[in-house]
Regions:
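Class I S-adenosyl-L-methionine-dependent methyltransferase catalytic core
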Residues: 1-132
Length: 132
């Protein structure tokens, strides 16, 4: 009985994700990451990398270019997906300045309005429902 008991308190993202995989995903692995970027999350938190890696602007040769709202996958083809989307909305002029400000925004992109950001989330979730 104790082997199925997992603490619900943790400050370690890797521990949290690995526990979710253990409890809820029979294969204990993430099949797809549609917003992979450089995969630093997997390396930093010791989470097994997904077989299917997509990104709108791939940084690595093994990552396939794809918009997460239109994945090149069959319906019902995977069991688990990791989604780490853009989370910022701004119209600030600092995005166009050539300086060290807004590093996150410049690297990952932003949406001009919260409404557009939330629409991106909604469209992405509809697509994930299709492939899961």
């Amino acid at each position: 009985m104790m082997k199925n008991l997992i603490s619900s308190i943790s400050y370690d993202q890797g521990e949290i994700i690995n526990n979710i995989l253990r409890l809820h995903v029979p294969s204990h692995k993430i099949d797809c990451d549609p917003t992979y970027s450089k995969g630093n999350f997997y390396k930093k938190y010791n989470v097994p990398e997904p077989q299917l890696k997509f990104d709108i602007s791939p940084c690595l040769p093994e990552v396939v270019q794809a918009d997460c709202r239109h994945l090149p996958m069959e319906n019902d083809s995977i069991d688990c997906l990791m989604f780490d989307p853009p989370f910022l909305a701004t119209k600030g002029p600092s995005l166009s300045k050539d300086d060290d400000n807004n590093k996150i925004n410049k690297r990952f992109g932003v949406y001009p309005t919260e409404k557009e950001l939330f629409q991106f989330y909604t469209d992405s979730l509809v697509e994930f429902h299709r492939v899961l």
